[in-house]
Every structure is written in C-alpha cells, then in structure tokens.
Amino acid sequence: MRPIHRRPEKVAILVTAVLFAITIIFSVFKNGKGTSPIPVKERPLKAFITSAYYYSSSKSLGKNALALVMSINLVKSPNELAQHPNPPELVISAENDTTSIMVKTPYSRVTPHDVCQIITVFATVQLLPNVKSIKMVSGNELTEIPFSKPSSLKRDVVVCTSPLFVSEQWQNFLFAVHIYKKFDAHMNLYLVSSITSFYELMKEYEKEGYMTIQPWVSVKYPEVSKIIADSYDQIEFRNQAAAQTDCLLQFKESARFITFLDLDDVLIPKLAPTYAEEFQKLMVTKKRSSFIFYHKENYNVAATRYGSKFSLKNMFNSMECQNNRETGKIVVNPKHLNFTWIHYPPISPEELAKHEVTENVITHLKTIVWVDEEPDGENQKIIEPLYYDNSTDTILSRQQIKELETDLENMMMKPNIQKIFAQLPDIHYYTDLVVNCYNDRYYKYHYSGRISEITCPGPQLCEYHQHPNITCMRVNATYHSMKTLSPITYYYANDPHFTSEMGCYAH
C-alpha cells in the first residue's frame, strides 16, 4: 500500500495574501532556461483567446453582449529591458446582416499577482443583435475570432472541475460524480490528459448524462519566441483561472449556482436535501453575498486498486478525518459575478461581499491508499463517516450510502462499462511522478516560507517519463500563426479533440 498525499488533479494553490506579497516584494518569474534580457525597446503583446461567448440577452451583461477571456503576456520580469504598450482598452468590431460597429472596452485583470509572465484577463462589451462576425482590432488590422453561445440547458447546480492532466484517479472520479448526481448537480470536467481507460470511463458517464467532458486546450502562440511569450513555463497551474472563468461564463444564464472544485474536493450537502436548497438557504441569510465560501477538511481514505472490485461503500467505510483544514472554494450566483481566480474572485462587486460558511465543509480526499484487498462488499456493514468536528454528526446516512452504491452497481452492470472497469489502472505511475515533483519544486518552498524561490507554479515544473505500458488520451487543437500586429496580436485555437498519439503529458 502506498499513500498518495497529492495527485495531479490536486491544484497547488498560493494563498492570495502570499501572492500579493510576492507581487509587491519579489515580482519573480522565469522567462525560460538560459534566456537573456530582451534587447529591444518594446515587447509585443500576445493574447490567446481562451473563451468568447455571445449573449443575445444576459441578466448581468446586458443585451447582445460579448464576454472574452484571454491569456496575455502582460507581466514584465525585473531583468527585462523591453517595454510593452499595455493598452488600457480593447477595440472590437462586429457585424450582422445589415450593419457593423466598432467599440472600445476596458479589460479586468483576473490573475492577482505577477509571478507568471502570462496572466488571465476578462472583458465584456455590448455589440449588435444577431452578430455574424466578431473581430479584434489592432491598429488598422482585424483578426476575426470564433465565438460561442452560452449553454441554454437549465440546471440547478454546475460543478466546474479543475483541469485534469495525466490523470489516473478513477476512484476520485467515481466518488465525486455519483455524489453530484445524487444531490442534483452536473459535473463539467476540464480535461487536458488522462489514462486511456479512465478517459473511456468518463466518456461512458458522459453518455449517461452524469457529466460533461470539456477539452481544455493549451495556450500557444505559434512561431513566437519564448522570450516574448512563454506559454509553456509561464502560465499558472495549467491556466486554471481561465478554465474556471470559462465555466462561469458558459453556464452564466442557465445555472442557478456554480461551484469550482478539484476532483478530490467533494462538497456534500448538510443543511438541505440538495445542493440548490443548501446554497439558496445560505444566500437568503446573506442577501448581499456575491459568493459563499466553504473551507476544505482533509480526509484519509482507502480504495481498491482493481476496477472490478470497486465499492463506494468501502470508500466511505474507510474515511478518517485528519483534523487539518485547507483553503477552500466558492459557490456563486452567476448573475453576480463575471470572472474568478483559483480560490475566489480577485475583486468583488462593491455592494456585495463573501459569506464564509461555518455550517458545512468540503470533504477533501487528501490521502488515498490503493489497497489490494477489501472486505466483501455484500456482507460489509455500512459505517457512516463522521463529520470533522468530533460531534455525532455524519457526512452521509446509511441509506444515502446504500443509494449511492446501488447507483454505482447499476452503472457497472452495463456491458461497455463493465469492460472498462476491468481495464482501469491498478498503479499510480504518473501520480507518483507529479507528487514527487510538486513536493521538490513547489511545496518545500511554499510551506517553509521561501516565497522568493517560487517560480511560476504548475505541471510544467515536472518531467513526464513515459511508461511503455501506459497510454493516454490528450487534448489537441488547430492553432494558427498570426502576423504581428500592434498593440496586440490575437491568437486562438479551434477543433479541440482528444488523441492517443501525443503521449502522457500535462500540456
């Protein structure tokens, strides 16, 4: 048995106060290995459009509104000689069948620190009815960009799951996805790469309506030097803030509530029978809240390494609270918020405030042990896992656990899924690589207070030695080279898809 203290899905987070300290005191980031100060007077700005949503009508953005999320190389390193134009506004052109307009709009910074060269920004502007074409304007040049309409399928709660990479943790997924379904939430999971059999399992759950897989493409600036815009080493945690903001915008008009969780963070309702009822109850008591904030409580858990023997009941039976808390995550009413960072928004509307929840916590599966043998599931008594506060309260009742187990068994009996369960990974090879890397390259500095030694954090810190017997599905897309424009050159990708031909990597 080997304990897993952190997984690829686990997002290493810098507390906001620490990040601002870094910004003020150190402003440190790495421009790439062996690079020199840029010997030019001006560094050109490169913006990759990760999201562009057009709303014919929005309760918070207005009519005919465009919402943009971009990754842009706005941060300058201390040893950099170049200046960049840093324009205060974006210029956007739009056309419909009868007319066209050109408008200017400011952008808001989402990333609250200068640790990475490339940061996330958000912008919104009202355009024309029935827009057919949207173009970004740079000087006298136009760049047409693809845009989408937000989801119109009404849902009470959407869980936005942080981007997964080289993911093997199928037990975490099953634990989370069945709980979300039971309490009336839909998982929208952002995926970079995963073990092939795990990907196939998620696809089957997607077909059954439990969740949606969202391909999360890498930011790339084709034919641009890393000195100018380093999209490999200089983006924070696989662009997680952009992913969460994308999810917020995608379900802005269709979901009552949206929450942002890692795969090993599972929020279980305690104050009401469903997520929506609990969130509504908390929001009503704090009418001026822009979001509610749940802390995370760490738990140990054991799970079989063999897919055909998997049991949710046995996972619940093994849960033990570590009595150790970590910074949590938020739940938002999407009408009140337009963008968010990893933990919470860098800014909140002045008339609104956050509400810190004291009546419930996120169950964080901090340490998972993969075991060879488990008790016989059919004869095993259900043990209700205790709530973290040493009271007699339990996280779930016996009846609720029984219902979750029945739901799992029904899925496992489906012929296609039954075959996949037999093929799920029984070792955590890439998990160990990333855990050791993160501990050596990030955590030892973070937890020892050696903040000045931290460079832009994320999976790019790690090496991914390929295993000859393990294959992965990895996201790819079509990227486009662009003519350099001033003040900003705009880039984008289209046709996102998964392929088995690119290996097991985080980018």
Swiss-Prot record:
Q: Which Pfam families match?
A: Glyco_transf_92 (PF01697)
What name does this protein carry?
A: Glycosyltransferase family 92 protein F49C12.5
EC no. given is 2.4.1.-
A cellular component term from Gene Ontology for this protein is: membrane
Protein's UniProt keywords contain Transmembrane helix? yes
Query: What does the UniProt keyword field contain?
Result: Glycosyltransferase, Membrane, Transferase, Transmembrane, Transmembrane helix
Q: Name one GO molecular function term.
A: glycosyltransferase activity
- Going by the record, the broad EC class of this enzyme is transferase
- Please list the residue ranges annotated as the GT92 domain: 155-444
Top-rank taxon, per record: Eukaryota
Spell out the InterPro entries in the cross-references.
Glyco_transf_92, GTase_92
Q: Does the keyword DNA-binding apply?
A: no
Assigned protein family: Belongs to the glycosyltransferase 92 family.
Where does it reside? Membrane
**Bilayer topology annotation:** Single-pass membrane protein
What transmembrane ranges does the database entry give? 9-29
Please classify the protein's predominant subcellular localization into one broad category: membrane
